Amino acid sequence: PASSHLGSELDFFKGVTECHLYGVLIKDIIVASRLKFGSIRPYGFTTDIPIYKRFFSGGSYSVRGFGYQQIGPKDADGNPLGGDYQFEGNIELRYPIAGNLKGVVFMDTGNIYATSFSLNAYDLSYGVGTGMRYVTPIGPVGIDLAFPVIHLRPIDLSSYYFYLTIGQGF
């Protein structure tokens, strides 16, 4: 918790729970998954959480298929406002291509909730895609191509995002 008694200007509790599961499907084919839930709640004299403390989702290490921090509530100009609750889920199939070159196919999902949390499949943003990882001595370097899936409608192939990554997303 952040507390005025501990030197903070704000009083709030913020918690994040994240679960990672990995399994070998067949020989060198790995299934990797992640679930993340976050919550921030004010108390005491703090009534609203300032934007710089809120949760944001979207982007290469979050929900691919969307721009950085572009999931969730936005102001009238389309700028992200963040929220008090966060949900993200990822599943990725990792497979060898040749030597240090690996391939991935994935589906990501998530949402940011302004003031109340209600998990509903139609409220979530989804992204699907594929990518490659080159394994170096300091970790993988990757490139992903992802498409947003809006309200579970068919994929629009003209709307896509490329991501360059260093390290595993999860």
PLM feature segments, named:
Residues 21-23, 93-95, 134-136, 145-147, ...:
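Residue-level signature of outer-membrane beta-barrel architecture
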Residues 17-19, 33, 126-130, 141:
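One face of beta-strands
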Residues 1-97, 105-109, 113-115:
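C-terminal outer-membrane beta-barrel translocator/porin domains of Gram-negative envelope proteins
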